[in-house]
Amino acid sequence: LLILHILFINDKNHLIFLHRMKLIADSGSTKTVWFLIDNNGNLLQKISTDGLNPFYQTEEQVADVIKNQLKPQLSINSIDYIYFYGAGCAFPEKNAIIQSGILMVLQVAGIEINSDLLGAARGICGKEAGIACILGTGSNSCFYQNGLIYKNVPPLGFILGDEGSGAALGKKLIGDYLKKQLPQDVQNSFAQKYKISTAEILDRTYKQAFPN
């Protein structure tokens, strides 16, 4: 988030400063942080909402988050442009879900949907070439050049990939807990803190939304 903040506040030559009032989103599967920025690059407001990921949510669910969590917190009624950088936003058909959901609630002159990795790369590298990595609920990396991701190994999500991520570490921890393979003191502490049964864990993992 700090990287994105530095990028969009300090890079006065970036395209977004052609617009009067910008809303910039950095979204993972767990949380979305929205930055409201004026034409001079001043940060006016920072808002947190639930995460938005088009692999797990429909247009209507995206719209619900925007309507009930973002819009009530916005200090102004008019946004000129939205730049959304999000997990799962690497495919046009998935980007369309986020875009449609946002536009159901907010009326803007323009909107761009890109991957969270591109947002991180632009924040880290600016106009220079370089390697950018992100590590959160998921994990990803790329070689960045000329404002775009030039090379990337697909992260494949928490089931097939996302090595080293919070989801991967959490999956390992939960698996060891259920198999009673944790050190006894850790096993006891986990059980006492979360008080969750094997049936509940399996239900949340295989039946409920956002298993990661």
Residue spans for each PLM region:
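Short glycine-rich, Thr/Ser-proximal phosphate-binding strand/loop in the N-terminal lobe
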Residues: K22-D64, I149-K151, P155
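Conserved phosphate-binding catalytic cores of ATP/NTP-utilizing and phosphoryl-transfer enzymes
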Residues: A109-C133
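Short glycine-aspartate micro-motif
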Residues: K22-D26, Y81-Y83, G130-I134
